Amino acid sequence: MSKTLKVVGRLVATAVATVLVGGVAFANLSPELGGKPTKAQRAAYAKSGHYQDGEFQNLIPTVLTTEGNTFTLLWKFLFGKSVDNEKPAAPLPMQMLDSLSITRKTAYMVRVTWFGHSASLVEIAGKNILLDPMLSVEMGPISWITPNRYNPLLPITAEKLPAIDAVLISHDHYDHLDYQTIRRLKDKTAHFYVPLGVGAHLLAWGVAPARIQELDWGDSVQLPGLTIVSTPARHFSGRGLTNRNSTSWSSWVLKSPTKRVFYSGDGGYGPHFQTIGAQHGPFDLALMECGQYDRQWAQIHMLPEQTVQATLDVRARVLLPVHWAAFTEAHHAWNDPIRRATAEAARLLLPITTPQLGQPVTLGAGPLPQTVWW
């Protein structure tokens, strides 16, 4: 028996090593890996106050693994026992988005359409703003390892979207910054606003330099009738095994003369939410990370109850939970995030909207979607 276990152990170890070596080799050749900031850019990043020894830092001490180490996380991801209901049994309900309907709006209307995971279209001040537009079914350069989208289709394709005024990227992980989507959007998007260092990926993928602007925390840009502000998050970055934290990560604030919207990006709970609320709130709506949590990475992703508290911290009137209903990236039931978030929001009397994929949420136009569809 022990001999058999040793043989199995060697086979498993060999398989893991093969996956790692093959993955690194392939990723280093794949354009999806993106680009690298120049030496001059890295020197400039040191002035940001949160870049040290070649890596971006969080505002408070943060570790990637609160239990185990990187190897145990990888082992759990590849071979860990799945939980019940980790993936939906059938495609999720979805409303197809008519591209013509996006053009029908006024400068005063705020409409948000969530596509699943974090990808969302925010129509505000007459502008089309895309948040982390990961609009592909497969993720990353090695799709047989990484999770695929639950639904085989999205509410709309990148090709059918109208002209985009700005794309906002929160960080460079594959489930938020997608090579194929950027390639399809690069010629119809006026501006790409990204955290420090992320511009190198876009340049490598053929986005015109004039369309790319990197923003540090606290930086802002002005479009007619709209202010966009980069604000802190508590996370990490990297698209390979050797470039962790070489680029920054952000949350985002959108301000029109009459409405304000907040997008958390990815990240753990922290005091930055209260600071953002004090500086930029109150918000009419907050799109907040809610999903892909685990006790092994408790400082870089929020529990649903923390999502609700963070929404209160930023002083948002309504919560729209995102970062779920598309990919399985953690060992919890696929609908556990929304069940727990709605329960906690009810307990704390926080309004929450729960649209289906592709269902528009229009502020000030009557009751917001609250159907229990999961």
What annotation goes with each model-predicted range?
Residues 2-147, 154, 160, 195-263, 284-291, 340-358, ...:
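Metallo-beta-lactamase
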Residues 2-10, 26-54, 58, 158, ...:
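Cap/insert and terminal regions of metallo-dependent hydrolase folds
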Residues 48, 145-193, 281-287:
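Active-site metal-binding motif and surrounding structural segment of the metallo-beta-lactamase
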Residues 117-123, 222-282, 298, 302-306:
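Catalytic core of the metallo-beta-lactamase
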Residues 122, 132, 171, 178, ...:
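Divalent metal-coordination and catalytic microenvironments
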Residues 133-135, 172, 233-234, 265-267, ...:
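Active-site metal-binding loops of divalent metal-dependent hydrolases
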Residues 135-153, 236-244, 294-300:
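Acidic/histidine-rich helix-loop elements
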